[in-house]
Amino acid sequence: MFHVEEESSGGDGSEIDEEFGGDDSTTSLSRWVFDEKDDYEVNEDYDDDGYDEHNHPEMDSDEEDDNVEQRLIRTSPAVDSFDVDALEIPGTQKNEIEDTGIGKKLILALQTLGVVFGDIGTSPLYTFTVMFRRSPINDKEDIIGALSLVIYTLILIPLVKYVHFVLWANDDGEGGTFALYSLICRHANVSLIPNQLPSDARISGFGLKVPSPELERSLIIKERLEASMALKKLLLILVLAGTAMVIADAVVTPAMSVMSAIGGLKVGVGVIEQDQVVVISVSFLVILFSVQKYGTSKLGLVLGPALLLWFFCLAGIGIYNLVKYDSSVFKAFNPAYIYFFFKRNSVNAWYALGGCVLCATGSEAMFADLSYFSVHSIQLTFILLVLPCLLLGYLGQAAYLSENFSAAGDAFFSSVPSSLFWPVFLISNVAALIASRAMTTATFTCIKQSIALGCFPRLKIIHTSKKFIGQIYIPVLNWSLLVVCLIVVCSTSNIFAIGNAYGIAELGIMMTTTILVTLIMLLIWQTNIIVVSMFAIVSLIVELVFFSSVCSSVADGSWIILVFATIMFLIMFVWNYGSKLKYETEVQKKLPMDLLRELGSNLGTIRAPGIGLLYNELAKGVPAIFGHFLTTLPAIHSMVIFVCIKYVPVPSVPQTERFLFRRVCPRSYHLFRCVARYGYKDVRKESHQAFEQILIESLEKFIRKEAQERALESDGDHNDTDSEDDTTLSRVLIAPNGSVYSLGVPLLAEHMNSSNKRPMERRKASIDFGAGPSSALDVEQSLEKELSFIHKAKESGVVYLLGHGDIRATKDSWFLKKLVINYLYAFLRKNSRRGITNLSVPHTHLMQVGMTYMV
């Protein structure tokens, strides 16, 4: 049996939205008053699939122009009637991580070392080795020049770019490529899947600084991004390419770190051959990926102290070598030695850049692993501990090499004092294992974000910590990375080819991050154009120069990682393309409301007692699969709720803002639409019983709020009937979000488009004063009757109606489209995880129907 997938979806129709932040007192003091206005134009996003319970005579356009309308407005902020959970505690949200004391902060700092800085912390193991393999040492000045390159690479990339700029471009504490993309999507409608709702902008997570109307530059960028499909596609391709490089980085990081650490055996033992190093490295890698499932919180406290000891070793060995050999290497802080290095070595110096960039590997991990820790903790740890220890380590190696040119083949282990070799060797191997985990955990986070935003097939995600929801483990991805990592290690067998692949992956991520952060600085931060230009120009020039160097050695074996990254990119692109086509087709095929009205409240079939939860991917309209249920099944439930699991581009949606409800058709139909909104960081761990309970309670609150609004309308009609002696005068209700409703229609009823009017036209409705409820008592009786109906339906049982929608390319489609849709996308859908499995619904509660769309 198959299960419906919790596709991130939605529509572009209008919803009655909520402004959070008011307290209960302001809500209770809200009142409705009439405000006369000669003309009012309905928002063009008004829902087109709603139903007006009363028949209103259509007016000619000339008559409309002559009418004087009154609008009913609320004098203080109100909450969204659809977002019923928010009625409990409007605008409140409980923080996931509470303020901690000194002891817990120290523990968090240790975990920061173990998770974030392992990658960049082990770079001294191989940086000089790879650099001097490409550019052999001719004299001491070459060592000083290479050291100067390393120093200023550490200053420009990890310190200036990432610590002072990129870390602040986080999405409410989330880092990584897709966090940047999500942040941009919130401030400009650039997503290719048109699943946005106006109500999404009312989520608390959207309450970030937006482009100011006074700054024309930000608005121009926003408008151009939203208007250009080419720019949207280019932005998505950039994000997917960057994500593919992140996954590739998770392959080469373990290979490089472990092989360079195990390679120290050749210095300590001497009789160890490279083939034996490869075998031992493979064993270590298998162990590494096997313990990944224990998570960050369980291993962080163990790995943190180990990495702290490693940084102290780097600093101590560096100081020892500076004192014993040559302290004059401090003159490498003079950037002029970079110029002298290139002047003496020309092309070889350019080749050496491919090794130099390895000193900055792990910079992206600082940002990608941000979801685990705070910006300040990462900044302070890097500036006060990591960077000084790294600089001392590189200075010490340079001091040793200045008197031992021949040791450049394994600069780090050769510089370790013989009495400390084996303890340092042991610590370095532990540090290498930690470094390998840093990018793997970052990859897990990035993939989870991409899954939620519809850019990667769904995979099983295991949360390894009950306290920190960002700490996850993805089994399929973990073992896939292990397989590819072993292929890379066994096929290349040396750190030089792996180091080149490492540089390609890291620089690909860095350039993607530079472009996205530059866009954020222009669009969201509204940074001074001079600062933006300096950041973008300096970062891109440095990274492009490094990239040109590593690309010159692709044929040495690093092409393997490019092939792997290309495969990952194609998987994400195909999934996003297929999901987009599927969603657009379902929007086009949705059932017209006229058809449901013609069928009547029984929907042309038998209404059996019970509640049917029809999972679909549309947040607006009735999905075509519902018509398939009506024609396939002998009966349909007495109450049907169209449930859409929708992921929005925010890290987390508060529980108080989770559900949106809307009535479909008149009350006698007992049809509702529910949108359950989740952020890409949210965890869906509730059982199907808990989900049902929350959903039904929220529905009851929605119905009560709807009844209150109808009672208020009824009071308003009776109060003003005497003053209106001509029914040609039209009143419309202006809800707090600007939506327009007839006073004769319940506030939450959906307004039906006239078939002979375009969506952009002005829509007005007259009122039949005798059609509405006669008194508040009638409203109360109607409310109790409907609530009783819900309780009886709930007692009869809840069944999950799952429609398996699939797409196939038409026969006249071009060949490439058939290949992508009929084979690649179909294969990915077949092997991806179904969203309904998170609810653990028993098969006895499932009813499924398949449907294929031709695209």
Curated annotation (Swiss-Prot):
Species: Arabidopsis thaliana (Mouse-ear cress)
Keyword Cell membrane appears in the UniProt entry: yes
In-chain residues carrying the UniProt-annotated modification Phosphoserine: 766
Extent of Acidic residues compositional bias: 36-51
Residue ranges annotated as Extracellular topological domain: 127-142, 255-268, 320-346, 401-415, 489-503, 550-553
Intracellular or extracellular location(s): Cell membrane
Domain of life: Eukaryota
Gene designation per UniProt: POT13
Protein name per Swiss-Prot or TrEMBL: Potassium transporter 13
